[in-house]
Amino acid sequence: MDKNETFYALCHGDRGQAGWKYFVAWESGKMGAVSPHDANTNPPAFEVDATTAGGVAACNGCGGSVSMPSVFDRIKSAAGAAAGFIADGMQVASDSEREARQSICKTCPLNEAGSCVGCGCVIELKTQARLEQCPAGRWFPEICAAIPITDPIRNLIYHVLPVARNSNWKRNLDQLVLRQDLFNGKRVLAIAYEPRESGGGRIVPTVQPDEVLAYCDEIGMNWTDSRAFVNDTNLGEVVSFPWLLETVKSTNPNELTFYAHAKGVTHSDNHTTVKWAERQYRVCLDDWAAVQRALEQYSIVGSFRRFGEFATPGNHRWHFSGTFYWFRNDAVFSRIWNKVDRLYFGVEAWPGKMFKPEESACLFADNAGGMYLETEWEKLQRQIDVWEVARR
């Protein structure tokens, strides 16, 4: 097939992306994983191992190196862990949970002579306490017994507002196509748009739905269903969200759904929302083993969890900042799932309306700050490095 700038960007990727396997394919002239239509060679698609990187090869080039925390920080961390253990009544994790944690830690690159480079804790002790959590998000607090998931159906429901003045909606789809093989169930797209004849008022100029679908065809992003919605600048994703949920409605205990939206489409191409989006795709989709493990223990999981906002009726006042999250279908659709606040932030607030904080797990950057600020990303760099090194 012909090479072009779009495919080159998809393959090579930037810091925090997971395109190395595709970059190797690019250099060898085999792009079968993205668009296998070369009439001469027609190379087969890459095999997907959903237990490792969710259909995208783990990236060996992301993140920096990680050093053991200072003695002071290790003492501080140990003191905090001890205080938490005592406050929890010194409850230990179940035998099966401890074994699973220790098995993960045994081969982890962060394991340095029995201590975790990520947090500085002694692994043997850390894995005992039920409320401890891996600093790299590979195992989580054991609040309740796990509900095993077997051969899960993995759905994707996705919202895009294709703002015309920048390429960020394409950038998001470029991220998604690299990981689409993770989704073995439904892949459902909602497109919010402004009709061509619109004018005046709070209008966000967009490209038309047919152009979005054409771009998806160009890069090989396949959908099982799609629908266009006239954009409402006061409600945003809230307009399409009930329909998206309806398309995956099921109480199958082995069915899981990922919701996301094209992030940063109203901002410039070099805004902090670009790295925010890339980090969310990476964390939520590139280590399926960790995500499944979290979903076996919690009803909903995501990244950049924050507390204290969205004081609407019935909301438990927590959310995944950035609005990327996985949920168990049986946990959602066995409840009243279609009450979405008719406010612009309704979809971001929805998890906190559905579930208490203890029913959720954070895959990365718990208690996150304001991610629109570059200073917050500077603070997060060590967490990024820890997450990446743990998956090398």
Predicted regions and their residues:
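Charge-rich, low-complexity intrinsically disordered regions
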Residues: 1-7, 11-47
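Short amphipathic alpha-helical segments that mediate assembly, nucleic-acid/protein binding
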Residues: 3-4, 20, 71, 78, ...
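Membrane-proximal basic amphipathic "stem/tether" segments
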Residues: 6-13, 67-83, 151, 373-392
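Interfaces that engage single-stranded nucleic acids at replication/repair/recombination sites
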Residues: 11, 24, 125, 145-150
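Cysteine-centered metal-binding/redox modules
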Residues: 46-147
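ER/Golgi luminal nucleotide-sugar-dependent glycosyltransferases, focusing on the catalytic module
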Residues: 143-392
